[in-house]
Amino acid sequence: MAAPVVGDADLQSVRRIRLDVSGMSCAACASRVETKLNKIPGVRASVNFATRVATIDAVGMAADELCGVVEKAGYHAAPHTETTVLDKRTKDPDGAHARRLLRRLLVAAVLFVPLADLSTLFAIVPSARVPGWGYILTALAAPVVTWAAWPFHSVALRNARHRTTSMETLISVGIVAATAWSLSSVFGDQPPREGSGIWRAILNSDSIYLEVAAGVTVFVLAGRYFEARAKSKAGSALRALAELGAKNVAVLLPDGAELVIPASELKKRQRFVTRPGETIAADGVVVDGSAAIDMSAMTGEAKPVRAYPAASVVGGTVVMDGRLVIEATAVGADTQFAAMVRLVEQAQTQKARAQRLADHIAGVFVPVVFVIAGLAGAAWLVSGAGADRAFSVTLGVLVIACPCALGLATPTAMMVASGRGAQLGIFIKGYRALETIRSIDTVVFDKTGTLTVGQLAVSTVTMAGSGTSERDREEVLGLAAAVESASEHAMAAAIVAASPDPGPVNGFVAVAGCGVSGEVGGHHVEVGKPSWITRTTPCHDAALVSARLDGESRGETVVFVSVDGVVRAALTIADTLKDSAAAAVAALRSRGLRTILLTGDNRAAADAVAAQVGIDSAVADMLPEGKVDVIQRLREEGHTVAMVGDGINDGPALVGADLGLAIGRGTDVALGAADIILVRDDLNTVPQALDLARATMRTIRMNMIWAFGYNVAAIPIAAAGLLNPLIAGAAMAFSSFFVVSNSLRLRNFGAQ
């Protein structure tokens, strides 16, 4: 049934509500809850079986009302608690569930081994049946089919009360039917047994299915245990990320004293102290102190970053040395750290189109299986087979037809991929990215802040005449830096940064729009526009003239340095390319992708950057809206476009592309516009992110092919009487185990 669409007129009143749903045991349960919720007018719901979270867009309904709807469907629900920082006491629900299942599994397995051995012996060699053999088998089977299998029976009973079915219904009915038939055979009138042998035992187990009932319980418990453990491992990366948050923070009081409070109580604009080895509690600005900060947990970047006063810092990172006084600019759920955790959680609760199809199939699958099982048993009876043979076929169909693998195919892969991506600094916001990635053929780059560092630097120093020695170069740079150290111009900072130890300047003079001058070490030094420097003494030095023409043709800034009235050097100042730019572009081209540069710079500058990094083509003089037009034109030409931007002024282009990747620190614009957030300021994460998305889609497709193929092939085989119910139970458990194990391979993505 299609979910009611919330109209545009109602957008202002639409509330997004997330519920934690417990009691779901398979994809059919999730489909049932989703259907119940979507029957409510003005509600659009999506229920994820793997994460047990219902995401609901509702008009005019409160969370408790929606919880009531879920309760009426036979499950439990409570408003989802947004957690950004987990303390050590936080429990892992999947891990706890796995431990409970393990206790039942161990008891069941210990009893199943002698039960299977004795059952096989008594079936193959009837003469070995000692007096009371039926009681022995019953005593061994009873704890398994009752206590160990109780999780299945309890859900089946609840389903029966609500007139619904689920995977547990199939399992419980199979176990109960096999047990009842076996007890009837053991303690009822037994026909004389003709012949013996292993093949006869495998085909019908001598009409006694206690080992089948116990075996199905063991195999299904094992499958559920490994499934729960895999889901726990899949979420471990997210839990580890969340646990990085500071638990306590030392707030700096007005009198200089420090007060330690829980990090959750920190307020915006409060100042706090962070010492070596401590985690920064919130996003903020350094007010006092200097320290190296370990960003690896947040960005995957191994190299520490040095923070000085006025530098921005990110919560969740660790101070390695020094003491920092930080003023909080974002706290709690507003921090970048919290936003990244939410991104992973939201990605894990979304559904791909393939998963919606799988959930729909699972929702109707169980009733269909009962019909097929009944028809198969009836057909065998009509064909002249005995009741025990017909029952064996019916039981085999019920046991083998588990749709659990179908329901786990996509969510488990997404959970593992999003967790691994978080460890690498790659945050996939949802399935849109995964479903688009396989058809990407064009990657478009912004320049400033994406291919470049977004900060001016001296790129070349050209000396005049015979002054080509390194000593002459350092001397001129030092003189220029000394004069510029008194200036506040952006170009000045680049020149000062190029000289390690500029000297003092006297008589500093700044001429607006032209340059600066001053006395340094007894020399009169001028730094500025070539036209201003040569206003009285023309420069005819070929090297300097050539450097000026080359730099200006590339859209770079060229300044001359004059010492005592003689032009000594030309400094070319430009936005520096990132070290990773060329390698990242080469990696993309090696994957057969076309690369394009979009920039607001002039044609010469755009072509120069494109040539330096190996980009196929460049489009210059672009305003933000012009970038959107270019991307739209590429899409109209049949290309599938990925846009890589810094997320600040590239928001429209990131949204307009088929796939948006925001690289950098994850600004609000980036988080809202991009499909993939690359926290590390390293362009090599672009091909890595594309590879992760492709690997995830390959895993999902493999899981879906297996899950669909298994059910399509297994049911006819069981209906044909070619599978003993015990083997059917093992095959069903292996199906789910294969899916979760295949998904867990993504945990090793990118490991070198």
UniProtKB/Swiss-Prot annotation:
The chain crosses the membrane at residues 105-125, 132-152, 167-187, 201-221, 361-381, 390-410, 491-511, 714-734. It is a multi-pass membrane protein. Gene3D superfamilies: 3.30.70.100, Calcium-transporting ATPase, cytoplasmic domain N (3.40.1110.10), Calcium-transporting ATPase, cytoplasmic transduction domain A (2.70.150.10), HAD superfamily/HAD-like (3.40.50.1000). CDD domains: HMA. Residues 15-78 form the HMA domain. InterPro entries: ATPase_P-typ_cyto_dom_N (IPR023299), ATPase_P-typ_P_site (IPR018303), ATPase_P-typ_TM_dom_sf (IPR023298), ATPase_P-typ_transduc_dom_A_sf (IPR008250), Cation-trans_P-type_ATPase_A/B (IPR000579), HAD-like_sf (IPR036412), HAD_sf (IPR023214), Heavy-metal-associated_CS (IPR017969). One of its GO terms (molecular function) is copper ion binding. Belongs to the cation transport ATPase (P-type) (TC 3.A.3) family. Type IB subfamily. It is found in: Cell membrane. GO terms for cellular component: plasma membrane. It holds the Pfam family Hydrolase. Its EC number is 7.2.2.-. The active site is at D446. It catalyses: ATP + H2O = ADP + phosphate + H(+). A metal cation binds at C26, C29. GO terms for biological process: copper ion homeostasis. This is Cation-transporting P-type ATPase B. Disulfide bonds: none annotated. Keywords: ATP-binding, Cell membrane, Magnesium, Membrane, Metal-binding, Nucleotide-binding, Phosphoprotein, Translocase, Transmembrane, Transmembrane helix.
